[in-house]
């Protein structure tokens, strides 16, 4: 019987995935590197090693490519901040670019549309997910009450610049990392939709393998028949 679960990898144990029905949540204590299941995935690998402040990050940079590999293997979605270098490192298409060799494609969204306190611009990478389903269910709009990062008032005054969210509060690191419940539910729904697509791909791959084996068997059978005929001493013409 095919599982109806999806796996959420590299997630916060206090976040929304841990309590969601049908979600197998893998936080740091479970070590998402060990996931070898066939269920589609939602992946949130650490962004520090691939962001603008990567030289200060102590996160494991190998988790990003591993998360990409999982999405390409079983289907689903990967979430990372806008401009993440992980996209270049793993040759994922940026939003607006053609799909890659895995059928993967990307979309830019803002998590404020699902209830985050800040805009939190995000890039999503999909494999096995129908773009029509995504565009039919994606949200836009929303007004932030906080800003993820902004310079101090002294820096703004010294440089004579106008900061877009100067009147907003700065988010704490906890608020910044938080995934809105509605956003998580949307990603889970999209990842679940990849199950049939990825199953069809596997079936086609298996069918191709069977055909290759069948052709080889035919050739081997012909060779065996010819050898048997020669051994039987068929009269020469």
Kindly label every feature range from the protein language model.
Residues 230-233:
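TPR/TPR-like alpha-solenoid repeats
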Residues 1-208, 212-221, 235-237:
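Class I S-adenosyl-L-methionine
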